């Protein structure tokens, strides 16, 4: 049985979703089915993290370190994650492993950008001062599809963290387990509490919220 990750802890829910092996149509595992209340808790946790400044005001070099550590942790679980993703999604084991490696590369790529988010200053003449500063949005909510869940999750999660945003991710009901392996690896990097939250629920309920 797999859990949601909210506010720095793996948590269960009253209801469960069944995840089936598409090759056999047989049940593979269950995962906690997040409710609207769970989604709200995740959003509030992300907002607290953003408001605390631990992530949004962290020095760029610190965010670089976090993202590189995340990439290392993802590579370390690539074989385990590939087996999980293969069973729940129907990919070949090689394609599933490549998806985890691709996820790690996204974090490596955006680690290289995390300390290069620069403002601009345009000289407009006497009496004018013109400059642009980029600030984190605060909270990024991301809904991930079933077909490339690990890769697509990393593609949007990595830049959000690089820019200093806290994130709430809704995983797909059909193949949420590989993303649990992904987040378990990410957590080891030591991000601030509430920086990343993972929930699995029905799109018409949790996703719509």
Briefly describe each language-model feature range.
Residues 1-31, 62-65, 69, 101, ...:
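Terminal low-complexity tails and localization/encapsulation signals of metabolic enzymes
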Residues 4, 18, 27-41, 190-195, ...:
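Histidine- and aromatic-rich ligand-binding microenvironments
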Residues 13, 39, 78, 96, ...:
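Alpha-helix N-cap/helix-start motif
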Residues 18, 30, 84, 95, ...:
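Conserved beta-strand positions that form and line the central face of beta-propeller blades
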Residues 22-24, 36, 160:
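Short connector loops/turns at beta-strand edges and beta->alpha or beta->beta junctions
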Residues 26-117:
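Glycine-rich loop-to-alpha-helix module at the N-terminal edge of alpha/beta enzyme cores
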Residues 119-209:
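Rossmann-like NAD(P) dinucleotide-binding subdomain of oxidoreductase/dehydrogenase enzymes
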């Amino acid at each position: 049985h797999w859990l949601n990750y909210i506010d720095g802890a793996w948590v269960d829910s009253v209801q469960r979703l069944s995840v089936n092996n598409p090759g056999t149509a047989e049940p593979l595992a269950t995962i906690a089915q997040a409710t609207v209340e769970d989604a709200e808790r995740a959003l509030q946790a992300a907002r607290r993290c953003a408001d605390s400044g631990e992530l949004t005001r962290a020095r760029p070099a610190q965010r670089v370190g976090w993202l590189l550590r995340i990439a290392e942790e993802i590579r370390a679980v690539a074989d385990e994650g590939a087996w999980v993703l293969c069973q729940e999604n129907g990919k070949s084991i090689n394609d599933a492993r490549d998806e985890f490696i691709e996820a790690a590369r996204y974090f490596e790529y955006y680690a290289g950008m995390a300390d290069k988010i620069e403002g601009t200053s345009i000289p407009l003449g006497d009496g004018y001062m013109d400059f642009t500063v980029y600030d984190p949005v605060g909270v990024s909510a991301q809904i991930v599809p079933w077909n490339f869940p690990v890769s697509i999750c990393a593609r949007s999660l990595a830049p959000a963290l690089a820019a200093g945003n806290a994130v709430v991710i809704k995983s797909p009901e059909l193949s949420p387990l590989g993303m649990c392996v992904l987040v378990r690896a990410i957590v080891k990097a030591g991000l601030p509490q509430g920086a990343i939250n993972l929930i699995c629920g029905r799109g018409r309920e949790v996703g719509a919220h």
